[in-house]
Design a protein with these regions (language model features):
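Short, flexible micro-motifs
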Residues: 14, 25, 65, 69
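Signal for well-folded cores of large energy- and translation-related assemblies
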Residues: 20-24, 42, 46, 66
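Acidic beta-strand-to-loop metal/phosphate-binding motif
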Residues: 26-30
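Ribosome large-subunit tunnel/peptidyl-transferase-proximal elements
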Residues: 1-23, 34-39
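C-terminal structural segments of small proteins and small subunits
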Residues: 50-79
Length: 79
């Protein structure tokens, strides 16, 4: 998967910060994450024109990042 070998930030606060700074090229969100966490990220991604892709579970998203815990959000960073 593209996520593991890419430069990235993990976690909702870091993802929002990367999007607003203009350094995020794509955001991945877990479908099973709480809406109060994902909704603001989706809104800021729409505002800044960053694509969002949904991953089935927080655990799957964490594993795709090469970490052993779940995460709600990941942003791939521009080169």
């Amino acid at each position: 998967m593209e996520i593991e070998n890419s430069k990235k930030v993990v976690g909702s606060k870091q993802v929002r910060k990367a999007v607003t700074k203009g350094v995020a090229k794509r955001v991945y969100l877990a479908k099973d994450a709480e809406p109060h966490i994902t909704r603001p990220i989706i809104e800021v991604c729409e505002q800044y024109g960053v694509g969002v892709e949904m991953i089935e579970t927080m655990f799957d998203l964490g594993r795709a990042c090469g970490i052993e815990v779940g995460t709600a959000a990941v942003a791939l960073l521009k080169d």
